[in-house]
């Protein structure tokens, strides 16, 4: 919601959002086939659409310029940069980059430090908020949050299920 607030009014009394009139684009981690099934950020309709579920809804949202979702090849900073160059101008604006540091629902693939550093620097240069999803990678890091080991400073961190460190009563 915070990312969409830069594009759409919350209510009639709100000020004009900075990117009103542009189509928000969400960048998420791709699966090996270039699809969106590797990213998982929850079970809300929005996060399910980010993952490629509800394809009819996703197609309609894109067709009507409400928002667009594009997958980024795993650990491919050049692909990320290409998408930013293509989708962060004119009628489009990259609304956010959402990713796990370890794709736990896709074989526990770890993002490289180089990929994270380069993509996060591009995001900073282009006013693109970053959400690091630590839902399943929390607590087993000596730094509590794995993003600290990557020396990155995301705008948003999703935390939760991993806090018990795999120990459940």
Give the location of each predicted region.
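Active-site PLP attachment segment
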Residues: 151-169
């Amino acid at each position: 919601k915070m990312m969409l607030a830069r594009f759409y009014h919350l209510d009639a009394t709100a000020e004009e959002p900075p990117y009103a009139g542009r189509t928000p684009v969400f960048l998420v981690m791709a699966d090996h086939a270039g699809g969106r099934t590797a990213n998982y950020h929850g079970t809300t309709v929005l996060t399910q659409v980010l993952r490629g579920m509800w394809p009819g809804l996703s197609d309609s949202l894109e067709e009507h310029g409400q928002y667009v979702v594009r997958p980024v090849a795993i650990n491919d900073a050049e692909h990320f940069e290409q998408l930013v160059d293509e989708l962060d101008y004119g009628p489009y604006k990259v609304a956010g980059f959402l990713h796990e540091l370890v794709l736990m629902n896709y074989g526990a693939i770890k993002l490289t430090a180089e990929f994270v550093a380069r993509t996060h620097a591009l995001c900073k240069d282009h006013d693109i908020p970053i959400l690091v999803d630590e839902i399943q990678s929390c607590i087993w890091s000596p730094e509590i949050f794995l993003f600290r080991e990557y020396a990155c400073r995301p705008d948003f961190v999703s935390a939760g299920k991993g806090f018990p460190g795999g120990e459940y009563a």
